[in-house]
Amino acid sequence: MSQQNQLEPTGFTTRTIHAVHDARYDASVPPVYLASTFGTAGEDTTYMYQRGANPTRDNLQATLAALEGAEHAYAYPSGMAATAAALGVLEAGDTLLLGMPTYGGTYRFATTELTKRAVKTRFISDFTTLSDEDFTPDVKVVFLETPTNPTLQVTNIAAVAELAHRHGALLIVDNTFMTPYLQRPLELGADITVQSATKFLAGHADLLAGVAATNDPDLAVLLHRGQLVSGALLPPIDSYRLLQDVKTLALRLERQQQNTREIIEFLSERPEVEKIFYAGSSSAEQAEVQSRQARGIGSVFSLLLKDGGDAQAFARALPIFVNAVSLGGIESLVSLPAHTTHGAYAQEHRDEFGVDDRLVRLAIGIEDVQDLIAALEIGLKAAFAG
């Protein structure tokens, strides 16, 4: 491609498709390099061994960095591998401020693996009350999801970043529910953003991957070390597949969000439903924050059945929806957080953060919305049939 024909794309989907280019052969789709080792006789030793670097993974990482608005992005074999790499900044004697509720895997990592490393964890249930007094000298990292899983509470990323940085602490944001299409935490002050690429980025429930991104060169070294030293890196074939999948992210999410809005409207009129949790639903303040820092509500939400409702009967009877954990795929899913993703929670934390047995999480796909609504009617009737 000649220099005069080059244009820096500004649109999100344009970047997903054209962020990387096969300069050698001008192929419309960059090739996949499966080699485990590369010749080193020449001057260029960028690629020596697949664990250190791989052209296909580099193409993916360059694309992910462009989408995140980041200088550096790194691909891992799972979202938890990305989270573990980011939390590798913590050392013995440090304290982590962990936003709650949070994904069960993150909770388990903090309460087991970090504890073994002599890292303390303090749980934060309401970031609006976070103050200077919370930042003792040992606090090095704040880790949060916004919106949270599974009750979709929203946190003001910019406000927490400003407070954390004032005390020399880092802010890590799990952006799985929003993706960089809807929300870009690094632009709001976060130091690292992580997400399970298994979910929306891949979008077809057939690939496991994670990503961490940063603008800080020192943190980039840490994140790359998380790949290199532990071997937690995404293989070339999975990198290639994710590179292809992410090209349709915006199209999928727009359809998923539209379905979600219509389903929430339907459920809000149902007498069987006590409460619906979606990003910004808890208060006018949270709605304002969500509208300011994100471009929508995403396609994951939870509902609380009224007393007497049987969530397990609801999930079992629900047609079309797959009764399974995960989210972000083209197919709609139903799960019961208390028994699945958040089963690792101590009972006191389940009670405190609203992970109730009657809580049902729905991840909406791209099916025709009238079919999803018809399926939900069947599930609601089954939940109260006893």
Which residue stretches match the model-derived regions?
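Conserved N-terminal alpha-helix of the aminotransferase class I/II PLP-enzyme fold
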Residues: 32-33, 37-84, 88-89, 105-112
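Short conserved active-site loop signatures built around small residues
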Residues: 2-32
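Conserved PLP-enzyme active-site core in the AAT-like
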Residues: 2-8, 72-269, 277, 288
